[in-house]
């Protein structure tokens, strides 16, 4: 959420962000309700001062033994008007807050202007992408080795679900443990195991609601949602709190299943693991001081990179343009792993700096020093990594001519030293 004062003083910047991110423009509504709110508050202050004055006059009249009925009637009239205006203020606040929640974050000046992923800028490539004649897509590799059962998962649940079988389940579990181990032991994150269900306030705090409600799985007749990412539950752990200054920076990491309807993905990536309604992900979340958040973004990207480097998977990093930046982010990098079957790089991690956008929505502040005014923290998050897509990348990049899959060196301890999946 943007500060209403910022929008009041910079309406054109807020409108520009709406255009750049392809969002509806709510700026005029915000300015209208902001003006109404400030007028009501001014009028309320006048009325409450009058009520206080009349109250003192009533007390003085009674003390002197005079009739105070006229003043009491005046007092009731003023009190009724105050209540009426308080009710009006509540309605205006609700409207103002709704429209504020619909305004996207302002892109950082370093973000390239563009419409979609065609305008993203590749800033780094690591490893040599390989495509050999015998390479098969990961779903065919998995079928030949009896690793992934899409058919029976479809029977149990529906399309875009999968059942991991045998060594695939073990590989998925190994990847989760490996990723968590790297982030905890090498990067100083604190491991969490948060709920997989979040309430409406939490989903609003991180920016999923109200915009993305149609893409969320909502529990029937309840204000609970299956989380689309651990970002929601990790970030909201500190909602409505003032953190001590020495608490920052705070790094959290968690593995959770994630649930998304993928409403806009009809007909895309219909085979394999790339786009599932339920998938596993290791998520990193940071709470940091505002002055250090872009340094922390670079560090976050490096943390996600480290996993790909240890797995020896070819990847590239792209800086997202304004049109592909997302609703809540001020700046975002995508890490994209090489998938031979697609003959391209596919997203495996997004690392974003939200500045104080989420913190303002979720009311997460910190006090730099005792007695100082509380400030909003800056929040960041990044996938570290999407586990199913990592498994797909291993099946494709580590496949052998005989159909077996070599286990990456760093994962062999999780397989009791085995070399291949066969």
Swiss-Prot record:
Compartments where found: Cytoplasm
CDD domains the UniProt entry points to: SerRS_core (cd00770)
Record keyword Aminoacyl-tRNA synthetase present: yes
Positions bound to L-serine: 229-231, 283, 383
GO CC term (a single one): cytoplasm
Record key words, sorted: Aminoacyl-tRNA synthetase, ATP-binding, Cytoplasm, Ligase, Nucleotide-binding, Protein biosynthesis
Superkingdom in the source lineage: Bacteria
Protein name in UniProt: Serine--tRNA ligase
Organism: Natranaerobius thermophilus (strain ATCC BAA-1301 / DSM 18059 / JW/NM-WN-LF)
Lineage, top ranks: Bacteria, Bacillati, Bacillota, Clostridia, Natranaerobiales
